[in-house]
Amino acid sequence: MSNQMTDSTSAGSGTEHSVDTNTALKAGSPNDLKVSHEEDLNDLEKTAEETLQQKPAKEYIFVSLCCVMVAFGGFVFGWDTGTISGFVNQTDFLRRFGQEKADGSHYLSNVRTGLIVSIFNIGCAVGGIVLSNIGDRWGRRIGLITVIIIYVIGIIIQIASVDKWYQYFIGRIISGLGVGGITVLSPMLISETAPKHLRGTLVSCYQLMITFGIFLGYCTNYGTKNYSNSVQWRVPLGLCFAWAIFMVLGMMFVPESARFLVETDQIEEARKSLAKTNKVSIDDPVVKYELLKIQSSIELEKAAGNASWGELITGKPSMFRRTLMGIMIQSLQQLTGDNYFFYYGTTIFQSVGMDDSFETSIVLGIVNFASTFFALYTVDHFGRRNCLLYGCVGMVACYVVYASVGVTRLWPDGPDHPDISSKGAGNCMIVFACFYIFCFATTWAPIAYVVISESYPLRVKGKAMAIASASNWIWGFLIGFFTPFITSAIHFYYGYVFMGCMVFAFFYVYFFVPETKGLTLEEVNEMYSEGVLPWKSSSWVPSSRRGAEYDVDALQHDDKPWYKAML
């Protein structure tokens, strides 16, 4: 990046003065950075920190509610996941979009099932890359409203489908485009709005809403399964209009991202946004300090010119590593195998002899939703790295039991092996499926979004998050499409495949994912600039908070062999 930048004039002030070397470094700026402000940055930082420490918890209610409203975008995604798993087993849906057997009953072939379930993910991948640009151009709020409208268009096409499966298929692609944009813009707006000490928890609310949507989707399927007509699936789809209207209305009360406003030179609006989210006046030291930090960071990024897609590979500091990390984390989140249960949970538990597999899916949904509340605590108390690592260990253990019981005691081709089939074994598998979902919901489910939302500088954030999210959707498509074929071929041995992925994920997180707990987005950038080793990153301290004896070199090198460094 360039070591020079132009003078910046702060709104509401006609004076300029230079910031000394230490102050410039604190702001993440080059030494000759000039800013417009009445107070020295050192004094502002001290005053702002004192103000924040004295703020009662109730002062964060408004910004928390705003972030929860934005996180409701996750509910839209979860609702689709929870309902589609039931649709593919409902009689009216099978009659309209399936194929007829010789006995007059209807079924969905593996190909058609895979396409209907998984094509949504392809739409999401494209929407995440293409439609998320609306947020960079017109703002995060306008971007979210736009993609919600696209989502509704897709829902209308699905509801209007009568007996042509490809019409329903097209509707799922279009609704996927909208949800793909939501999955990028929602965590992005939350991470840019939330106070740093609450950011992990509030970004995790996005995953909480996903689990809430999955749970209510399961419940709605259970409530409509006894109907014999299109009420079975059209009512759950029709409820999507209510969710869309609720979110659009909510966007009217959510302040725009201050970082976006500063980037588009709307300084006064940024000041108002910061004041609104912090529940203070626009002249408060907290607003002045946060605005100055954002300005200095963005001015530095603008000095290097507009970000290109190629900068995700060639950019500094460590942009290729950070881009690859986002792709890997989002890919591995899918390779945990969660959608194996969520997309096909009803089908799976039919195969193990459960009397009402819809009820079993509701149990999984309850565990998933309840566990995510625990994640709101763990993400900011145990750190991102530790949660991901512990999650890998827990899920590996669950898959060992789940798959081993499945391949030794249960056979999907039950009549061929009636002597070794066991309903008790099926119950055991459900228990460990619940343990697995607890491990997933408290670790990888929310933290994957937290990690990518706070790993990139603003200049490339939209593009980097879009690429990372696209990798998640592509793997979601592959798992959703091929799961019917794989389970038909290897049955419950499939669990060992996901177990192997989690073993790989453990080592990847340990060696390549740094700890970002408690850091501002600008401080994360500074950590990457200093080349801190990921397994030592939890000990890293930003330059603005270091003592005289702080040794950053010790965090950049490790003389121990890798296997000792892990212990």
Swiss-Prot record:
Main subcellular location: membrane
Skewed-composition ranges (Polar residues): 1-24
Transmembrane recorded as keyword: yes
Ranges per topology, Cytoplasmic: 18-62, 135-141, 189-199, 256-334, 380-386, 451-466, 515-567
InterPro entries xref list: MFS_dom, MFS_sugar_transport-like, MFS_Sugar_Transporters, MFS_trans_sf, Sugar/inositol_transpt, Sugar_transporter_CS
Glycosylation sites: 89
Residue segments, region Disordered: 1-36
A Pfam family: Sugar_tr
Keyword Disulfide bond listed: no
Coiled-coil zones: none
Residues annotated as transmembrane: 63-83, 114-134, 142-162, 168-188, 200-220, 235-255, 335-354, 359-379, 387-407, 430-450, 467-487, 494-514
Disulphide bonds in the chain: none
Subcellular location per the Swiss-Prot or TrEMBL entry: Membrane
Keywords for the protein's UniProt record, in alphabetical order: Glycoprotein, Membrane, Sugar transport, Transmembrane, Transmembrane helix, Transport
Molecular function in Gene Ontology: carbohydrate:proton symporter activity; D-glucose transmembrane transporter activity
Gene Ontology terms: cellular component: plasma membrane
Membrane topology of the entry: Multi-pass membrane protein
Parts of the chain on the Extracellular side: 84-113, 163-167, 221-234, 355-358, 408-429, 488-493
NCBIfam families documented for this protein: SP (TIGR00879)
Family: Belongs to the major facilitator superfamily. Sugar transporter (TC 2.A.1.1) family.
Protein role: Low-affinity glucose transporter.
Record's protein name: Low-affinity glucose transporter
Species name: Kluyveromyces lactis (strain ATCC 8585 / CBS 2359 / DSM 70799 / NBRC 1267 / NRRL Y-1140 / WM37) (Yeast)
Record lineage: Eukaryota, Fungi, Dikarya, Ascomycota, Saccharomycotina
Gene that this polypeptide is encoded by: RAG1
